[in-house]
UniProtKB/Swiss-Prot annotation:
Pathway: Isoprenoid biosynthesis; isopentenyl diphosphate biosynthesis via DXP pathway; isopentenyl diphosphate from 1-deoxy-D-xylulose 5-phosphate: step 4/6. Binds 1 divalent metal cation per subunit. This is 2-C-methyl-D-erythritol 2,4-cyclodiphosphate synthase. Changing E144L: Little effect on the overall structure. Its cofactor is a divalent metal cation. Disruption phenotype: Cells lacking this gene reveal a filamentous phenotype. Its EC number is 4.6.1.12. It comes from Escherichia coli (strain K12). GO terms for biological process: isopentenyl diphosphate biosynthetic process, methylerythritol 4-phosphate pathway; terpenoid biosynthetic process; ubiquinone biosynthetic process.
Length: 159
């Protein structure tokens, strides 16, 4: 078994909506990013890549490459997952923590879990997504952006 950890953060800027966990969430602000700014899927992709020792999302999909401008993070996750499977890994489980004062994530979490399970080809019982605030402390508490942490457990397929 191998464990990976991922972290991502994006500042608010421009107009909404935002995309988190693949879900379009109405909000007055957008997130500044080279891709679609999906902090949840970026952190999750990093966790999965880390567990497989395949580097990180920036190595695989560099923000200096115009091909990834405005990229759909679900597509990036699926491509990373294909590479991980090619190394002989299957999924144990993933756990994602979204850190944001606003907007409220709770109503959107069930759909996030559906999308992640679809993209990883796994059962929803293998996907957990939760959200928390920082009680108005720090940059997320001041409403300057959104952060996310994720962990992933991979299992090496037996031959």
């Amino acid at each position: 078994m191998r464990i990976g950890h991922g972290f991502d953060v994006h500042a608010f800027g421009g107009e909404g909506p935002i995309i988190i966990g693949g879900v379009r969430i109405p909000y007055e602000k957008g997130l500044l990013a080279h891709s679609d700014g999906d902090v949840a899927l970026h952190a999750l992709t990093d966790a999965l890549l880390g567990a497989a020792a395949l580097g990180d999302i920036g190595k695989l999909f560099p923000d200096t490459d115009p091909a990834f401008k405005g990229a759909d993070s679900r597509e990036l996750l699926r491509e990373a997952w294909r590479r991980i499977q090619a190394k002989g890994y299957t999924l144990g489980n993933v756990d994602v923590t979204i850190i944001a004062q606003a907007p409220k994530m709770l109503p959107h979490i069930p759909q996030m879990r559906v999308f992640i399970a679809e993209d990883l080809g796994c059962h929803m019982d293998d996907v957990n997504v939760k959200a928390t605030t920082t009680e108005k402390l720090g940059f997320t508490g001041r409403g300057e952006g959104i952060a996310c942490e994720a962990v992933a457990l991979l299992i090496k397929a037996t031959k």
